[in-house]
Amino acid sequence: MPKMKTHRGGAKRVKRTGSGKLKRSRAYTSHLFANKSTKQKRGLRKASLVSKGDQKRVAQMLTYVK
C-alpha cells in the first residue's frame, strides 16, 4: 500500500501543540477592518484550537505533521 500524503493546504494552516491539540488561526482577518471594533480585531489576533467535531478529520489530513 502506498504512503499516505499530508494535505499540504491543511499543513500550512494548522500546527500541533506540545500536548497534541491542533492550533489554527482565525477567519475574518484579511480585510474590511474599518467596520470591525478594536476589541473584535484584538480577539482575531489570538490563535484558536480546532473544534472537537473537526479534530478527527483534520488530524487525518495531517497524518505526519508533528
UniProtKB/Swiss-Prot annotation:
One of its GO terms (cellular component) is cytosolic large ribosomal subunit. Residues 1-26 have a biased composition (Basic residues). Disulfide bonds: none annotated. One of its GO terms (biological process) is translation. SUPFAM superfamilies: L35p-like. It comes from the Bacteria. It holds the Pfam family Ribosomal_L35p. One of its GO terms (molecular function) is structural constituent of ribosome. Keywords: Ribonucleoprotein, Ribosomal protein. Residues 1-28, 36-55 are annotated as: Disordered. HAMAP family: Ribosomal_bL35 (MF_00514). Belongs to the bacterial ribosomal protein bL35 family. This is Large ribosomal subunit protein bL35. It comes from Macrococcus caseolyticus (strain JCSC5402).
